[in-house]
Amino acid sequence: MNQNLPEPNQKKWIPDGFHFLGPEDSKYRRTLLETISGVLKKKGYSEVFLPAFDYSSTFIQTVSAPDSSSLFRIRDLSGNEISPSIDLTVQAVKGMAGFSHQRENQNIFYIGRVFRESTKGSVARKEILQIGAESIGVSGKENTFKILEELDEIISLLPLENKLTLVLGNVNLFQSIVQEFELKQNEIEILSKLLYQKNVNEIQKIFGEKKNHTDLIRLLSSLVLNFDLNSLKNSLNINSLSKNLQKSLSSILEETYWIFNSWESKKRRIDLCIDFSLLRDLNYYTGFVFQGYLQDSPDPVLTGGTYDHLYEMFSGVQKNASGYALMVNTLESSLKTPLFNLSS
């Protein structure tokens, strides 16, 4: 007798966190994807197709500890531990680092799924469709601004119900501060997590009694809920710091000023705000980082930034890189009306 027959509920239902789209919803999704990919092709990006699985170690060495704990893991017949993708940026950069692709177009885009195990119960989505773009060989303030303009053009084509606000930070501000105070790696990990959560009280509790950490706490507290650049500069009191730290912080703030002022110079569909406590995946982000949020939605609808060391991890050759990903599922649920194929 076959002992592997599905339970009655398994015959009827799809596992929690996964979804089936019928013909009509699939048609609307296809139109949404073609609308976004049309902009990317016009901007000079070439499409690539990513593998569904990769070695688990590929993700573990690049993403943060909380993210790596949500990996689905299996062993293939050769004994290798493999996982469905939890980070498509990692796979895109890893793929392009292959020797045979180094002379091809280094501006690429992809459509793919990420899979994350969740402890939030049946309401949590475990499968997320993304469309993303990567530029290998370039980064910096000008390229970050170009990316933001691309995103604004994409969003302007979508009938979104709510306004999109993009939060811009730069992990180098935090890195410069913790390097100045010679913090240990475990302390940096704790601080980055608490800053991202905007938990100043816990930072003061942990580091308040440590010798010479008064300035550290003041600087880190300045990064929390301080969205105005001039106010942030005053709170940091840069002139009171060492020459090296003054130089580092001033340079980062000047680049951020440039992006913000350039953005505000004309009308945009996306609102831009500054938040230097936006500290994501310090294992590979190396400069500007951003997340986009729709009003009344707690989860980001887009993420991106600069990762100048990621390519080197897979090729041994240093190349700057930057990019972004849009969460298609969140976009779909935020449209006033479905996108219709204008050519039909």
Swiss-Prot record:
Biological processes, Gene Ontology terms: L-histidine biosynthetic process
Summary of subunit composition and partner proteins: Heteromultimer composed of HisG and HisZ subunits.
Keywords associated with the record: Amino-acid biosynthesis, Cytoplasm, Histidine biosynthesis
Statement: the UniProt record of this protein carries the keyword Amino-acid biosynthesis: yes
Additional record remark: This function is generally fulfilled by the C-terminal part of HisG, which is missing in some bacteria such as this one.
Family membership noted in the UniProt record: Belongs to the class-II aminoacyl-tRNA synthetase family. HisZ subfamily.
Purpose: Required for the first step of histidine biosynthesis. May allow the feedback regulation of ATP phosphoribosyltransferase activity by histidine.
Subcellular locations according to the entry: Cytoplasm
This protein's name: ATP phosphoribosyltransferase regulatory subunit
GO cellular-component term (any): cytoplasm
Pathway named in the protein's UniProt entry: Amino-acid biosynthesis; L-histidine biosynthesis; L-histidine from 5-phospho-alpha-D-ribose 1-diphosphate: step 1/9
Provenance organism: Leptospira interrogans serogroup Icterohaemorrhagiae serovar Lai (strain 56601)
Signal peptide residue numbers: none
